[in-house]
Amino acid sequence: MGDTMSAFSDSCMNILGYAGVPDANKEKIYSKIKEFAAMEDQSAPDDAARRLRKELGSYFYELYKLVFFKTLEDRHIPEEIFMFLYFGYIDEELAGEENTQILHDLAVSIGHDEEMRVFTFYQWLRLIYSCKKDPSIDDFSTDYITTLRKRKRDGEITDQQEREALEDGEARVKFEIDNMFRSASKMLSSRVTTFVPFFSGQTLTKPLDKSLLSYATVNKMLSIVKGIDFSLFYRQTVYTAPELGLDKTFIQVEVLPDIILMPLVGTRGAMWQEITGAKRTTPGRFLLPIAEEEDLSGVLIKMCAEFRWELCKRIQGARWNDLSERSLTSDYVDYIDTYRKNRDLSTEAKERIKAAMVKHRKSYKEMFIADYMTYIMYESSGALRHNKVVRAILFNYCPFSKIIREGAIATNPQYVQLIERFVHKTAHEQHLFDIATGRIEKAGNAIPPELMAHYEYLRM
């Protein structure tokens, strides 16, 4: 450990120097970092502590920009810089010796996700800079393109400036840092009211090596959830192939979310957006702290629940709660609105719904999230927790995978009829699919991969 630590004897000055911070500002930031590191209680409620935390927060995001843009020109990025970019590390005293060692070891070995679905925030910004990914929405659910369009409409920029800004890597990255990064960091943090974005060992509630996430861990946990709710990330889209006699065929395509590991310690996750832009077959965005101190499965399931809800609202538009157009959200809203008169609910079930409404402040979305989490975590293994009405809604729109339908709940009286109805519906869809593909094969053509993928979906 000693050899590694000796290389980090003055990380703060090294990082500030790398960023090109002017000497006067460098000394000021350095002194504030050291003052913060020396505090016995960095979450102290007094005015001086609050001012210091606020000041450090204002330094962090501007420093992150400077460091990021400098790395674009550097083929030999120092290890301390990666530690800053991946984890928010700034100072060995603030982090603590053991934590500094752990962060160093991960920073030099982190690599890339082979499935290209999970990214560090630094990797994510590079994709945005190179226009391979678009900046995320801001706090008002407005994306970068819409923001530029509004600025042009308001006369702030010209048509030419708008076109240039769309491909301006620096402007794109600044939009991401100034909007999503600033807001999401505090949202994900384990200390919302006393949040400081620089990494501090004092904020940890468990050993750091037990909370740091890897690409493999996140991908594995997401696969477990998908193994229960198989249709979670599938979207219905239209497939056309006139040369095969297919003018308008509805198929299901899986669109997995982009998952970004944010450089902070936290206890939450955020389903930041359900799609990218206006196209419905684009990836959503899930955010996780790179050091997640809560149980990852619960955090991820909660994000998936919110994704289910928000994607349905997006697809349904203004009619998301209109029962004349049946959907997950409209059926669930009706269930909550009419529970008092619902004869399929026992008195005990009605009391539970009433209590849940109080707990979740009458938020349909929050109530659904809680019910979905129970459905995935308990009902999928045969441990019944739900009443028959909400169970039917969830199974109708979020059916369990085949291995669960034929396993844990196969003979459960509460699920037998639901499963039979699902099997009948799927068999009908498979029959129609067989007719369509039969015509294609009869004409001597190969079945397109998109249709084969849809066939696999029908067998899940």
Specify the residue positions occupied by each region the protein language model found.
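Non-Sec secretion/translocation targeting segments of pathogen effectors
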Residues: 1-6, 460
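Feature targets compositionally biased, intrinsically disordered low-complexity regions
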Residues: 1, 16-19
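Active-site-flanking segments in enzyme catalytic domains
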Residues: 9-12, 17, 30, 37, ...
